[in-house]
Amino acid sequence: MCRYILFTLLTIVTFSVSFSQSDHVAIKWNEQVLEAIRNDYARPTVHARNLMHSSAIMYDCWAAYDTTSSEHYFLGNTIGSFTSVFDFENFEPNIPSNSLEKMKAQEVSMSYGVYRLIKHRYMSSPQWSSTLLNINAQMASQGLDTLIVSTD
């Protein structure tokens, strides 16, 4: 009986956590990257790099708005021969103080970052039109304009 109760509790906790996490924008964009991979040629090395870059983009977009974050991957760093210039001092005053507004800003930032990555990396994919429809629909579901190309 005790095992049954323990199993039931663990199942409930597991599913409640997985359902609540599936609504996060990072999960949704990761699914878009995986779908773009399915719509492309089999190129494991390229796709591994794209997954890493999408994760780094989402992390940096989150970390830019999180004042307790001590490290960034691209922002303000040099990776190989590429330097990403980022002015933390001028950016920090623009971070919303309200936690809900900050979370929304992080989600918007992540969305534009991964949207642009997918557009750039998969435009020569054999099923590019399907991928473009998917990512445009994702942006529309968040109320974001795909025509904005600002780097601010």
Predicted regions and their residues:
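Bacterial Sec-dependent N-terminal signal peptides
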Residues: 1-24
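Acidic/polar surface patches and capping/hinge elements
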Residues: 21-152
